[in-house]
Amino acid sequence: MRYLPKSPADREAMLREIGAASIDELFAIIPEEFRLTRDLAIPRQMGESEIVDHFQAAAARNANGYASFLGAGAYRHYRPVLIDTIVQRGEFLTSYTPYQAEITQGTLQAIFEFQTMICELTGMDIANASMYDGSTGAAEAVMMAIRVTGRDKVLVSRSVHPEYREVMHTYAQHQGHDAAEVEYIREGAQAGRVDLAALEAAVTEETACVLVQSPNFFGVIEDIPAIAEIAHKKGALLIVSIAEALSLGAVRPPVEADIVSLEAQSFGVALSYGGPYCGVLAAKEKYLRQMPGRLVGETKDSQGRRGFVLTLSTREQHIRREKATSNICTNQALVALMATVYMTIYGKQGIKDLALQNLAKADYAAKTLGQSGKLLFAGSPRFHEFVLETSETPAQVNERLLEEKIIGGLPLGKWYPELGHAALWCATEVTTREQIDRAAQVLAHAPALAAR
């Protein structure tokens, strides 16, 4: 972005135009304690050659060559180069919403195909393409369930991603809705899953919905049919949040759910230091008119030709704000296009094969790394993440791993105090056996777990 300076004369002219006598008067509404009265503490200006040297030195500090075992909702997968080749075409590379169907058929068709693929993956009837990410998708799903049922109490499993829960609580509390959390099972054959007995005791005729994640934050696959039976018995809706879309290549889709919230970052969307990601909402057809965001439908023009248009748009830009189902309005179509290209490249069998490869890599990693610690929730089915408890704290383990250019698992104690010595590890198709073996060698030099 260019820097466009303003001369004193420019400032005076602008102040006269808005009727302010001075800059101080313009900013008078801002309390004194929040106003900066000194010059910014920035370094001196640099010449061109100095700027080049500065950024070359910064680039040299990049973490190239590091093996990473981080997951927790943001996953490292291989991105085919064809994805950027397609999305960078001028016809697609825009943040503009495709309102004018007569000139945006390509974009609309791509969104329609994305919605179709998501429905095939999730087992739902309808899908949109315009949530910011998995967390806002889950929160919007909860708001949707409240509108559908007319109830205002929400139950969420504590095994749902902590940051997803934080976003959901933010939505709920500021709209006057009550959201309570249900514990997960700590020990036994069902460890890591939501406690079904506690859930059944908590669901009442006032419960709008039950929100679970599968695979959940611990990587464990939930018993969706059993959870659905408990929720539906009291007239509550079941929302299933999926933070790892690739799991649907190997895991049975949550067809018993009423609403599915999906994070599709794994489908060709780069990690990008946290976003933009690809949030999706899918649901049963009977809830169509309560879907937030935009939907693309198939139609015919005046000459009988197949075409695509935005339909049932209940965003605040289309209808009265008080009638809108959501105020999320950023155009996520370009990110959805990345996922569409990714799914098209791999196809149904390719996604299944890739999911099974992730499963195998994680199984090898769990068995290998588990020799130097204790695998928690080992009796429950999982996808490509697992929880490993060690004698050292995760911070100590990760410090030693970093010396070997390895980024270890995510410490869980921040959100789960009872798991202070445990970390969440992830392995995908880009994780090599050599990397797993190197990490295992570092862990093997830690004190024995029994000594803690």
From Swiss-Prot:
Pfam families registered for this protein in UniProt: GDC-P
Domain of life: Bacteria
GO biological process: glycine decarboxylation via glycine cleavage system; nucleoside metabolic process
Xref: SUPFAM superfamilies: PLP-dependent transferases (SSF53383)
Reactions this protein catalyses: N(6)-[(R)-lipoyl]-L-lysyl-[glycine-cleavage complex H protein] + glycine + H(+) = N(6)-[(R)-S(8)-aminomethyldihydrolipoyl]-L-lysyl-[glycine-cleavage complex H protein] + CO2
Keyword Oxidoreductase attached: yes
EC numbers on record: 1.4.4.2
Subunit relationships: The glycine cleavage system is composed of four proteins: P, T, L and H. In this organism, the P 'protein' is a heterodimer of two subunits.
Family: Belongs to the GcvP family. N-terminal subunit subfamily.
Role description: The glycine cleavage system catalyzes the degradation of glycine. The P protein binds the alpha-amino group of glycine through its pyridoxal phosphate cofactor; CO(2) is released and the remaining methylamine moiety is then transferred to the lipoamide cofactor of the H protein.
Official protein name in the record: Probable glycine dehydrogenase (decarboxylating) subunit 1
Taxonomic placement: Bacteria, Pseudomonadati, Acidobacteriota, Terriglobia, Terriglobales
